[in-house]
Amino acid sequence: MERYLTKMPIKSKANEVPKKEAFAKKETPKVARKATKTDTPKELKDKENAGDDNTPKQTKGRPGRPAAKRKNLDTPDVKDEKIAMEEENPPKRRSSRLTRSTRSMAEDGSPSPEKEKPEKLPFIKYKGAIKYFTESQDIAASADDVLQWVEKQKDDVVPMAFDMEWPFSFQTGPGKSSVIQICVDEKCCYIYQLTNVKKLPAALVALINHPKVRLHGVNIKNDFRKLARDFPEVTAEPLIEKCVDLGLWCNEVCETGGRWSLERLTNFIAKKAMDKSKKVRMSKWHVIPLDENQLMYAAIDVYIGQVIYRELERREKVKIKNEEEFKEKNGDAAFKAMKTLGETFLTKINEVTL
């Protein structure tokens, strides 16, 4: 028994728990941080000359992309200087108009009349009669009455304001011609709604094609083209040849330029304002009956067209008279020279002495 006891190991060194000191010795030593490199005096001087800053730059956006450069802000002194320069020499803006009137070029660059925006103009008030028809037989009877009135006139030319209305949809585009309005006398306007009309009455076709009738309006040629597309019994070309576009006529008589709308032409010639409500202009012109706002809108369009025609006719007569008197007094050569200069005869003709 003792023999066996002496041979058995009392304590194994392998089973001994190592001391804490042994574990501490086996731990991986921490890596010491590198000391921040200090710039030498020469490097600091180079950075100062280069304008570098030691402040870390903040980047925005994705990593790897350079940060957007910040815009340089002007100092108050620089801003004041720029404002003063702009006030002294304002930037020239290119006009959106295609042409410039000869009147504006002749009068030291002053704006042409069609560009002048009046402060306040009185709105047009139409107090005449409005004759409104929707059925084919009624339209035919009314057109025949106007035709007989035209034939009784002693003048060789009878001006007639002409305009059209139709519905418009942004999905389907323009609809069929729905309304024709005419005016031969400022005291009465005729409105023909074509919704129930499959074919234009012969009396109405005869009226607009009558040799004594001079149809006029703004952008009137396109109206005739559309009318001919919607109603094959109408031929556009004869109507286009004899019609008068009030905008083009105004450019000839008043020596202006550019394209005109009825609203601007009314401001310039009649010195009136038009209530061009988008709600009425884009309304359902094909729906019977038309309401009071639609009837007044349609009547005013042709009424003011007749007023503008009469005024342009008067101005043209005055201009022709002044030009003839100038030719008799100064000769054709002086007249051509004045036309070349672009002077307006209505205001300059009596100031020229040769």
UniProtKB/Swiss-Prot annotation:
Record Gene3D superfamilies: Ribonuclease H-like superfamily/Ribonuclease H
Protein residues bound to Mg(2+) 2: D163
GO process terms (BP): negative regulation of mitotic recombination; nucleobase-containing compound metabolic process
Residue ranges with Basic and acidic residues bias: 13-50, 71-91
Gene Ontology CC: nucleus
Major location category of this protein: nucleus
Coiled-coil intervals, chain numbering: none
Residue spans of biased composition, Basic residues class: 59-70
Sorted UniProt keywords: Exonuclease, Hydrolase, Magnesium, Metal-binding, Nuclease, Nucleus, Phosphoprotein
EC numbers: 3.1.11.-
Role according to the record: Has exonuclease activity on both single-stranded and duplex templates bearing overhangs, but not blunt ended duplex DNA, and cleaves in a 3'-5' direction. Essential for the formation of DNA replication focal centers. Has an important role in maintaining genome stability.
Protein family according to the UniProt entry: Belongs to the WRNexo family.
Protein name (record): 3'-5' exonuclease
